[in-house]
A protein has these predicted regions:
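N-terminal leader/targeting and accessory segments in enzymes
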Residues: 1-83
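Phosphate-binding loop of NTP-binding sites
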Residues: 80-202
Length: 202
């Protein structure tokens, strides 16, 4: 990821990555994301006051009140977070067979069918989608069809550590647009269909 070191040192140690300012604490890197409703660059100073080690920004902010924080500027903080998260968790998606299913309709049904077939063939499958996360008898709910990149990479690591050899996921158009799947190298891609539901203006 091309970047500019605005201040501080590239040798700054980071223990974890956050994009929710409420989780700010010493030793963390806070990625400032421009969302649809809020721009988390607004919370950079608050996070610095709480002791975060690194700020990742995509547009200039006033740094006068945070001289001790390492600040890195990138073109897209969402894209940067996706690659940073992959590196943080050891790029687990590269150590499993990755299958992505995208399209306007049919993603959930298709992923469940693929999961059933693969498991019948003896594969250990972790699945992420509209109905949540499934792996080896575990299930947990998700807020989005395609979770944020940090949660995705963390989940892939959980799959791998649990013994999964295959990761199967629904890839939403929003997930693609918002760089949630950036840095993931899919072995197999499945395209179901395209309808006006997913064709926006322009």
């Amino acid at each position: 990821v091309p970047f500019t070191l605005v201040q501080g040192s590239l040798d700054t140690e980071v223990q974890d990555i956050i994009y929710d300012s409420r989780k700010a604490a010493p030793g963390l890197a806070f990625v400032c994301i421009v969302g649809t409703q809020r721009d988390s660059h607004e919370f950079a100073a608050d996070c610095a006051a709480k002791g975060v080690s690194v700020l990742v920004i995509q547009h200039d902010i006033d740094l006068s009140a945070m001289p001790g924080v390492t600040v890195v500027k990138v073109e897209s903080s969402r894209y940067a977070m996706a690659l940073m998260s992959g590196n943080l968790f050891g790029n687990p998606s590269r150590q499993m067979t990755m299958i992505g299913v995208t399209g306007t309709k049919g993603k959930t049904t298709t992923t469940h069918m693929i999961k059933s077939v693969l498991e019948a063939a003896g594969r250990k499958v972790g699945m992420i989608g509209t109905n949540g996360i499934y792996f080896l008898g575990h299930h947990q709910e998700t807020a989005n069809t395609t979770p944020e990149s940090y949660e995705l990479q963390k989940t892939f690591r959980e799959f791998l550590d649990a013994g999964c050899d295959t990761a199967l996921m629904e890839v939403s158009s929003q997930g693609i647009m918002m760089d949630r799947v950036a840095g993931i190298h899919y072995d197999i891609g499945v395209f179901t269909n395209l309808s006006p539901d997913h064709i926006g203006p322009g």
